Amino acid sequence: MAAFDKCKTRPAHIDAILNGLDRYNPETTAVFQDYVVQQCEDRTFDCYANLALLKLYQFNPPLLNAETVTNILAKALTVFPSPAFSLSLALLPAYTQPYATSSTQATTANLPMQTADFVEAVQKLTHLSTLLESAQYTAFWSTLNSDDLYADLTADVAGFEELIRIRIAVEVGKAFREIGADVLMGWLDMRGMETLEKFVVDVCGWEVDKSKAEGENGVIVRVPRNKENEARGEVKGEKVGIEMFGRVVRRGFEQPA
């Protein structure tokens, strides 16, 4: 597993900022914001750099750029399950939090319209994160497709839906050896057996079994065995030295104080 603060695709000038005092220089905000745009375009993700930018926003609230923040959150969705989204959310102003206290709710009620829109955007993305992290994949897609605002919030992230489907497939591959194609179709928000088959075969390397199928019913998707989905018994043992056992017996004969 790669170190949290490392990213293979990170440009040298970003790495230099993160490892120097300029990391806390407000003048680097524009550089980090451009880097977020780059991540959205080339499908990379640098959590450490994004958190550094959010920390700059936290220290310098007037510099906060709402579009950049929502892009960071949208990108964090594409690497679930990971702490990236919750870590990003924790650095945002208290009034954006989805589980606000009575004091922050009172503050939110008096926010200007532009800021209120930002709060709504953050909370909608948080709802999507909750659905993904709790494996409610069908509900995630229905929610994503239920409001044009979701499309606007993820529009800057190239291949957003494809990246989410790949992450869902990775999680399915950890938990299943076989799964009904109709169920998987709902989890991946795909229409038609041909589209699903192309994805699971070409992208995932899985097999589609139609031997017992009647039309699209009864089609099974088979996932190759891996260390995560292989059912195996686990026997654990612990060696206890005789001197340890002797102390336990001796303590039983000791007189209480």
Curated annotation (Swiss-Prot):
GO terms for molecular function: ribosome binding; RNA binding; translation initiation factor activity. PROSITE patterns: PCI (PS50250). One of its GO terms (biological process) is regulation of translational initiation. Its main location: cytoplasm. It is found in: Cytoplasm. InterPro entries: ARM-type_fold, CSN8_PSD8_EIF3K, eIF3k, PCI_dom, Transl_init_fac_sub12_N_euk, WH-like_DNA-bd_sf, WH_DNA-bd_sf. The keyword Cytoplasm applies. Residues 45-227 form the PCI domain. Coiled coil: none annotated. One of its GO terms (cellular component) is eukaryotic 43S preinitiation complex. Signal peptide: none annotated. Component of the eukaryotic translation initiation factor 3 (eIF-3) complex, which is involved in protein synthesis of a specialized repertoire of mRNAs and, together with other initiation factors, stimulates binding of mRNA and methionyl-tRNAi to the 40S ribosome. The eIF-3 complex specifically targets and initiates translation of a subset of mRNAs involved in cell proliferation. PANTHER family: EUKARYOTIC TRANSLATION INITIATION FACTOR 3 SUBUNIT 11, EUKARYOTIC TRANSLATION INITIATION FACTOR 3 SUBUNIT K. Belongs to the eIF-3 subunit K family. This is Eukaryotic translation initiation factor 3 subunit K. It comes from Coccidioides immitis (strain RS).
